[in-house]
């Protein structure tokens, strides 16, 4: 018999200490990594539930194991909410991650060796959009497209590449692009050569759900997303589609299970269901609107302080600061800001002279600070502190002074009150 009072603290002090230290780190550091966010206690309650015990290979009503009558309800709730939230008529909530959702789409729509047009990783794309170190770059013939001199997607070049290489699939979506993507234009290009349009909206799904960023679901053949990032749910993936055939939906389901995964994580799917319900609340829209406002406010300060922002601004939750002219590397900036309890990630910028392990830029995102309650005033103040650190990157006294300010604002705006 298992006693409910069993706990980690009394049993595994070494593990518990690391967990507690991470809790303190999250409370005492300002999180600006664009792909990170804070999930609600309700989501964590679902993830720590007895649903973690249940194997449920298959789909609701079509399981390979008995005893699935209640987890069927859980998964169907998640499916129905995903469809309602994004205006889809198909949803698969089983992918363990965004990358596995993307793997399923490749598996369902393509054969190894097929040509795919994807955004260049160095211009803001993602590993799964064709990087040579990823399955996508190893199994498929990848043709990259990118951004123009203004820092925006070069649709003329994209169309030219599409007509020249005749890819079977075009990928829209990004991990470090601050503009608005013209999904309709991408579909028009895809249709002109008979290609699939697959959109990975992982970074902007929360903004899309709130109507703050254009919804790709009506335009793409298939859409994937993560359920964390701006959506603020548990770490996981999701596949969506609208207006497709039953044959396509069967292929997608089969590509997830049994094609790429075994049993789904029912405790995580419950967390997804909760997060999707939270995303339907009016306050979620207010939150996403503030995420975008905070990003614009921070960009304003960086520009005023003489820093270059890729594409000159932002229309979503993130932006890239190009440090080439400052003779700084992303690695140096990341480390110095980290010592001030400000967490960012080093990031390549277009035409970056440095390697991906060093880089010449940093990526900044506002979902997590907005979750804490930051508004434009706090966002601008924070951007100013970051510039102070970057202006005096080797001055530990400046870094310590900013760290004190960070600890103070973190105490005033706790993650979990």
From Swiss-Prot:
Pathway listed: One-carbon metabolism; tetrahydrofolate interconversion; Amino-acid biosynthesis; glycine biosynthesis; glycine from L-serine: step 1/1
Binding site for (6S)-5,6,7,8-tetrahydrofolate: 121, 125-127, 355-357
Lineage: Bacteria, Pseudomonadati, Pseudomonadota, Gammaproteobacteria, Enterobacterales
CDD domains: SHMT
NCBIfam families membership: PRK00011.1
Alphabetical list of PANTHER family matching this protein: SERINE HYDROXYMETHYLTRANSFERASE (PTHR11680:SF50)
InterPro entries: PyrdxlP-dep_Trfase, PyrdxlP-dep_Trfase_major, PyrdxlP-dep_Trfase_small, Ser_HO-MeTrfase, Ser_HO-MeTrfase-like, Ser_HO-MeTrfase_PLP_BS, SHMT-like_dom
UniProt gene name: glyA
Cofactor or coenzyme needed: pyridoxal 5'-phosphate
Protein name (record): Serine hydroxymethyltransferase
């Amino acid at each position: 018999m298992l006693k409910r009072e069993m706990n980690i603290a009394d049993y595994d002090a070494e593990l518990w200490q690391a967990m507690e230290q991470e809790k303190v780190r999250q409370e005492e550091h300002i999180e600006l990594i664009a792909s990170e966010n804070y999930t609600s206690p309700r989501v964590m309650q679902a993830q720590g539930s007895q649903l973690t015990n249940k194997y449920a290979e298959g789909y609701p009503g079509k399981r390979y194991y008995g005893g699935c009558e209640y987890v069927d309800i859980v998964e169907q709730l998640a499916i129905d909410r995903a469809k309602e939230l994004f205006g889809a008529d198909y949803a698969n909530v089983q992918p363990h991650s965004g990358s596995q959702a993307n793997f399923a789409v490749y598996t369902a729509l393509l054969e190894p060796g097929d040509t795919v047009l994807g955004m260049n990783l160095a211009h803001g794309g993602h590993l799964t959009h064709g990087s040579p170190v990823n399955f996508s770059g190893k199994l498929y013939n990848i043709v990259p497209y990118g951004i123009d001199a203004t820092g925006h997607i070069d649709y003329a070049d994209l169309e030219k590449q599409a007509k020249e290489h005749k890819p079977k699939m075009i990928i829209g979506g990004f991990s470090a692009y601050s503009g608005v993507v013209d999904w309709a234009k991408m579909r028009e290009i895809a249709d002109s050569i008979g290609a699939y349009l697959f959109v990975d909206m992982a970074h902007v799904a929360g903004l899309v759900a709130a109507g703050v960023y254009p919804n790709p679901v009506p335009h793409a053949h298939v859409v994937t997303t993560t359920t964390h990032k701006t959506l603020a749910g548990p770490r996981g993936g999701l596949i969506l589609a609208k207006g497709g055939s039953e044959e396509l939906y069967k292929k997608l389901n089969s590509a997830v299970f049994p094609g790429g995964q075994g049993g789904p994580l029912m405790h995580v799917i419950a967390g997804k269901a909760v997060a999707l319900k939270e995303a339907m609340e009016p306050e979620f829209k207010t939150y996403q609107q503030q995420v975008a406002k905070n990003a614009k406010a921070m960009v304003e300060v960086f520009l005023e302080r003489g820093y270059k922002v890729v594409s000159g601004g932002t229309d979503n939750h993130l932006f890239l600061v190009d440090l080439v002219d400052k003779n700084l590397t992303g690695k140096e900036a990341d480390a110095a800001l980290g010592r001030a309890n400000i967490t960012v990630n080093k990031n390549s910028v277009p035409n970056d002279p440095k390697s991906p392990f060093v880089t010449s830029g940093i990526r900044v995102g506002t979902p997590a600070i907005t979750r804490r309650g930051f508004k434009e005033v706090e966002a601008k103040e924070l951007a100013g502190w970051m510039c102070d650190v970057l202006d005096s990157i080797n001055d530990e006294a400046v870094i310590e002074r900013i760290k004190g300010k960070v600890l103070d604002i973190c105490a005033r705006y706790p993650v979990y009150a």
